[in-house]
C-alpha cells in the first residue's frame, strides 16, 4: 500500500493524491484527469522514469528527475565501477546537472561509438547453453539514458516554465516527514494509517 501524490512546484501545495495498492500508470492518468476536471492547467511534470509514465502526460513538457536517473545508473554500474566503459559512463553522469542537452548527447554518442563492440559482446551461458550479452548491466544503464534523454533537459529547454530537475520537493519535503510520522504510529491499523496520511496531506501547506 502506498500513496501517489501530486504537488504544485510553484505554490508548494499538495493538489491531489490517491492511495494505491501498487504504482500503475493508470493511477497517474486518473489523478491528471482529476486535476484537469477541477480546472488546473498542468504546465509541466517532473517524473521518476517509471516505464510507460511519459505516455500518461502526452503534450505536457516532461522532466526526468536527475536524482532518480543517477540512482538508476548507479544501480547498474555501482558506485565504484571496475570496467573502463562503466568508469567513463560515470564521468559523463557527473556532468548531468552542469551540462546541456547538446553536449551531454554528444558525450553519450561518443561513449557508445567507443564501446559499441564491447557492449555487443556475447558469451555462452553456463546454465542455458545459449548466447547472451556479456555485459548486460552496462547495456541496461546505457538504454536507460538513451530512453530518458529526451526528458533530461526539459528544465533548460523550457526555462520560462521554471521546472525543477528533481522530485526532491516531494521525496524530502513530503514523503520523508510522512514516513517518519507513520513509523511513530506503527501500532495503528491500515485504515487509521491512511486517515493519518490524509490528515497530513490536507494540512501540509498549512504548516
Enumerate the language-model features and the residues they cover.
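Short, function-defining helix-loop hinge/capping sites that tune catalysis or transport
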Residues: 16, 56, 76, 179-180
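Conserved beta-strand -> loop -> alpha-helix junction used to position metal-binding or nucleic-acid-contacting
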Residues: 44-91
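Hydrophobic positions within alpha-helical membrane elements
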Residues: 13, 53, 73, 176-177
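Acidic/histidine-rich catalytic cores and adjacent linkers
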Residues: 40-51, 91-207
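A broad structural signal for alpha-helix termini and local helix breaks/kinks
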Residues: 39, 57-61, 182
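RNase H-like nuclease fold core
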Residues: 1-44, 51, 55, 148-151
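A generic membrane alpha-helix/interface feature
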Residues: 26, 66, 86, 189-190, ...
Amino acid at each position: 500500500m502506498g500513496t501517489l501524490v501530486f504537488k504544485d512546484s510553484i505554490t508548494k501545495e499538495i493538489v491531489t493524491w490517491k492511495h494505491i495498492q501498487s504504482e500503475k500508470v493508470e493511477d497517474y492518468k486518473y489523478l491528471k484527469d482529476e486535476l484537469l476536471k477541477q480546472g488546473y492547467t498542468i504546465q509541466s511534470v517532473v517524473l521518476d522514469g517509471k516505464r510507460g509514465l511519459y505516455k500518461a502526460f502526452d503534450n505536457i513538457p516532461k522532466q526526468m528527475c536527475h536524482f532518480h536517473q543517477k540512482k538508476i545508473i548507479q544501480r547498474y554500474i555501482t558506485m565504484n565501477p571496475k570496467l573502463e566503459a562503466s568508469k567513463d559512463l560515470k564521468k559523463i553522469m557527473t556532468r548531468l546537472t552542469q551540462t546541456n542537452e547538446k553536449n551531454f548527447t554528444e558525450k553519450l554518442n561518443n561513449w557508445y561509438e567507443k564501446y559499441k563492440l564491447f557492449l555487443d559482446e556475447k558469451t555462452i551461458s553456463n546454465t542455458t547453453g545459449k548466447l547472451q550479452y556479456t555485459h548486460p548491466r552496462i547495456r541496461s544503464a546505457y538504454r536507460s539514458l538513451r530512453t530518458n534523454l529526451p526528458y533530461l533537459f526539459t528544465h533548460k529547454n523550457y526555462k520560462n516554465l521554471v521546472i525543477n530537475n528533481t522530485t526532491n520537493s516531494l521525496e524530502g519535503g513530503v514523503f520523508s516527514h510522512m514516513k517518519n510520522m507513520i513509523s511513530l504510529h506503527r501500532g495503528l491499523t491500515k485504515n487509521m494509517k491512511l486517515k493519518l496520511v490524509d490528515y497530513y496531506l490536507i494540512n501540509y501547506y498549512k504548516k
